[in-house]
Amino acid sequence: MEKTVVELTKVSQLLKLLGDKTRLTIVSILKQRECCVCELLEVFDTSQPSISQHLRKLKDLGLVQEERRGQWIYYSLNQSSDLYTLLEDILAHVPDQTEKIKQIEKSNPTLRCGC
């Protein structure tokens, strides 16, 4: 796999964003599956606006993309980002989030949001 050289400012912004445990966990979850905000609420002890703010910051840097389906928005990692290869390298050293994903799937947030 060919390594991409990324502008130092963008690398600094990426590392700063991933320095927050919630954002790092969100990105790690999104590596394994797409999610809507209400699904992410199942694994974080925080408010919906807080999760949305974290996702906005990740989206602003181009790490996360969104797809609207009806009134719901699903988030996933942006594999076409110039930071994606670096992000993958970082996430290779982060524990996978299988337990949190099981928690999401077990909780059935569709009863709450309809997504």
What spans do the regions from the language model cover?
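Alpha-helical residues within the helix-turn-helix
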Residues: 41-42, 53, 59-60
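Juxtamembrane/interface motifs at transmembrane-helix termini
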Residues: 46-49, 61, 73, 95, ...
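N-terminal helix-turn-helix DNA-binding core of bacterial DNA-binding proteins
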Residues: 9-49, 73-82
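Amphipathic alpha-helical dimerization/coiled-coil segments
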Residues: 2-5, 10, 80-115
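Short acidic/polar alpha-helix capping motifs at helix-coil junctions
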Residues: 1-4, 36-38, 51, 92
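Beta-hairpin "wing" of winged helix-turn-helix
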Residues: 59-69, 76-77
